[in-house]
């Protein structure tokens, strides 16, 4: 289980899940963690509610399916403490990085959205859709995130740039899932993300915000 991998780390664990997810509730009931039930639905909603209820100075978005590797947590937090970054984005597309879960559709899609963000929003990022993120809690609060779906991936990056927060990236390897299955729908969710980014671009060009 994912929680077993981080049980010896000095961190507070907050598990966000739907109230009717009885399988996960049973799996974590004896673990050293706090359980938070979503008041809404969706991938982005779970992350937003986790951020809202976190009480530590630094936070990490860590996947319950086992695809994020805890070996990256320490170097990512060091890039905040030592290098004075406010947000560190994990990346599957840098040297010494990769993904077990990627396919040609998701790779092309990620390349497109990352390029879109870098060109039109002056981002300097290599993987805009990966939300393995370590950040200052108060910085994440200031982003005032509102996406309940996968648009949250790009919302975090775009608002980080818009608000002038200092950020960097860290190469990560997305592991094979230990549990659950891929929920993202490449075309329908991709269209939502594209629509979100176009709206943000129009707002930027017309209203400069």
Which residues fall in each region the model found?
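Short, well-formed alpha-helical segments that are part of the catalytic scaffolds
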Residues: 1-8
């Amino acid at each position: 289980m994912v929680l077993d991998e981080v049980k010896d780390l000095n961190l507070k664990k907050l598990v966000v899940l739907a109230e009717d997810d009885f399988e996960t509730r049973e799996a974590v009931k004896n673990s050293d963690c706090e359980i938070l039930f979503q008041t809404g639905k969706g991938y982005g909603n779970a992350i937003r509610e986790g951020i809202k209820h976190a009480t530590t100075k630094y936070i990490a978005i860590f996947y319950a399916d086992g695809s994020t590797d805890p070996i990256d947590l320490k170097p990512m937090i060091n890039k905040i403490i030592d290098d004075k970054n406010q947000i560190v984005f994990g990346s599957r597309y840098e040297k010494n990085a990769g993904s077990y879960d990627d396919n040609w559709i998701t790779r092309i899609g990620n390349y497109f959205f990352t390029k879109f963000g870098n060109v039109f929003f002056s981002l300097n990022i290599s993987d805009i859709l990966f939300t393995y993120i370590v950040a200052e809690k108060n910085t994440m609060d200031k982003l005032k995130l509102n996406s309940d779906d996968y648009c949250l991936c790009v919302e975090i990056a775009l608002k980080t740039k818009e608000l002038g927060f200092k950020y960097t990236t860290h190469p990560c390897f997305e592991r094979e899932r230990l549990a659950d299955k891929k929920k993202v729908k490449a075309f329908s969710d991709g269209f939502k993300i594209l629509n979100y980014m176009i709206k943000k671009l129009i707002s930027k060009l017309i209203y400069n915000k």
